[in-house]
Regions:
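Short linear sequence motif anchored by a di-proline
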Residues: 1-134
Length: 134
């Protein structure tokens, strides 16, 4: 299973990823003590602004599996619209978000980049540890 710290790896995992492992596998892999996701379905396509599971440190200092919306608040000078790729981690706007208390693990089994092919459509290219993307 691939995993990425939100604060560090946004540039790797662009705007589409999948999670085909079940809750038990996620809890075991990341040693999440609490599961607050409810009945989590297989998520073959997770896009920005959608809810998806993350593993974070809870109020009791234990790891917990919870749902979170994908995206970070954007800089006010750019309208505050949510962003999904943080390339300038030295930007004053994002410095506070990089603190350990704001970090989490985003479980993923594969992620997608788009190949720059002829318009009107770009070709999706999936990356995973296994060819079957599971």
């Amino acid at each position: 299973m691939l995993y990425h710290s939100i604060a560090t790896y946004f540039d790797i995992m662009c705007n589409l990823y999948s999670l085909t492992k079940g809750q038990a596998a996620i809890r075991d892999w990341f040693r999440a003590r609490h599961d607050r996701t409810g009945n989590l379905p297989v998520l073959p396509g997770i896009f920005p602004d959608q809810l998806a599971p993350i593993v974070r440190t809870g109020a009791d200092s234990e790891r917990e599996l919870v749902m979170a919306r994908w995206g970070m608040p954007g800089p006010p000078q750019h309208g505050g619209a949510p962003v999904t790729n943080i390339r300038n981690v030295s930007s004053p706007h994002f410095c506070g978000w990089l603190a350990a208390r704001n970090r989490c693990i985003v479980p993923a089994t594969s992620f997608c980049e788009y190949e720059d092919t002829k318009p009107p459509r770009k070709t999706p290219i999936w990356f995973a540890l296994a060819a079957c993307r599971t």
